């Protein structure tokens, strides 16, 4: 066969895609060909242009020569070196909910007693609780962060900067009040009682609940096994969310509770500074009123890929907390759903 004709046939091979995402379509033409290779090489050499997940064709969280190699291989052979990623494995005991044609998984979490906050040998990151005993009733929590696809199904809009794959990217650039509106609308559509996780529920789930192995991060002591995060060498090319569920799950089967996007919790700004407090049962803190809602702060958990400094890992520990104004909507703020007792 003529080599030129063979090359043209290879460039027209079926595309790997899910939703609106076309893997390897760097230039947005809806086809994958040599022009995408050229565009990707340009991005790698210059670090120019806004990052989108479509540039990370091998799903390793970086955009570099390895992605160029993989894309060239696909253009020439029609086969990806790294298999297509279509979503995480869902625990067998998860419950599936559907709204406007979009399904998502919630995991029942058996209640129990645990020590919440940082221990005696752990770094006391500002804003974190001192260690204290908490007992929780059973609840349910999202297996993954809320995706853009689910947000779109509920709200009809998508505030996220990178919308290259709405089915697998977490929604981001959302304030606490944006998320509250989303939850209220979701409850109207389903007749159920979804909510944010409480501060204590979030930490218990991140630690692995009654199956906890005592890890520093959600599922491992090795942050790279379970979290997309940033250090002092981070650049704007790493300040973006990754597909949900690419990293290892924690003991319960929950993904990305360390890193990726920071997750809003229900509680108002509060902190336990002294370990000598009475044991707590199902704690949740909400002020009855505040003088200025714009200055109100709610708890945020998990860290993200934007938390870049020499101690960026610290933001991603199971006990680390932040207190953020309720109308702030940073590009790596997201959420995870819960259902309370």
Question: PLM features: residue spans?
Answer:
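Short aromatic-cysteine micro-motif
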Residues: 101-102, 124-210, 233-256, 341
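Bulky hydrophobic/aromatic "packing anchor" residues in well-ordered structure
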Residues: 26, 109, 114-116, 141, ...
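Surface-exposed recognition segments
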Residues: 122-132, 210, 257-341
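GGW-centered surface loops in extracellular recognition modules
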Residues: 85-111, 115
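Acidic glycine-/aspartate-rich tracts in secreted/extracellular proteins
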Residues: 45-49, 77, 112, 119-121, ...
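Cellulosome-associated attachment modules in secreted, modular CAZymes
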Residues: 5-86, 159-163
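Active-site Gly/Thr loop motif
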Residues: 219-252, 301-333
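Residues that flank catalytic or metal-binding motifs in active/ligand-binding sites
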Residues: 22, 53, 102-105, 110, ...
């Amino acid at each position: 066969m003529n080599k030129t004709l063979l090359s043209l046939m290879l460039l027209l091979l079926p595309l790997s895609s899910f939703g609106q995402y076309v893997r390897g379509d760097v230039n947005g033409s809806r086809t994958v060909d040599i022009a995408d290779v050229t565009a990707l090489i340009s991005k790698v050499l210059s670090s120019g242009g806004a990052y989108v997940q479509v540039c990370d064709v091998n799903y390793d969280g970086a955009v570099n020569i390895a992605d160029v190699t993989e894309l060239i291989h696909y253009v020439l052979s029609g086969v990806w070196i790294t298999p297509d990623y279509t979503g995480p494995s869902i625990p067998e005991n998860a419950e599936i909910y559907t709204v406007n044609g979009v399904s998502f998984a919630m995991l029942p979490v058996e209640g129990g007693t645990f020590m919440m906050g940082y221990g005696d040998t752990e770094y006391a990151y500002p804003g974190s609780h001192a260690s204290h005993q908490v007992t929780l009733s059973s609840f349910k929590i999202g297996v993954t962060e809320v995706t853009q696809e689910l947000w779109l199904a509920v709200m009809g809009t998508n505030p996220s900067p990178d919308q290259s794959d709405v089915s697998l990217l977490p929604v981001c650039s959302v304030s606490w009040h944006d998320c509250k509106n989303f939850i209220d609308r979701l409850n109207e559509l389903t007749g159920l009682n979804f909510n944010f996780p409480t501060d204590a529920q979030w930490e218990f789930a991140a630690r692995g609940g009654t199956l906890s192995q005592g890890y520093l991060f959600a599922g491992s002591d090795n942050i790279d096994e379970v979290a997309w995060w940033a250090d002092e060498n981070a650049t704007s090319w790493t300040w973006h969310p990754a597909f949900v569920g690419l990293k290892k799950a924690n003991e319960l089967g929950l993904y990305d509770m360390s890193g990726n996007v920071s997750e809003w919790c229900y509680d108002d700004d509060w902190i336990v500074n002294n370990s000598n407090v009475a044991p707590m049962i199902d704690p949740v803190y909400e002020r009855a009123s505040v003088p200025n809602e714009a200055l109100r702060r709610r708890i945020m958990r998990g860290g993200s890929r934007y938390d870049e400094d020499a101690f960026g890992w610290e933001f991603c520990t199971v006990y680390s907390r932040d207190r953020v104004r309720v109308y702030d909507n940073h590009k790596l703020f997201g959420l995870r759903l819960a259902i309370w007792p």
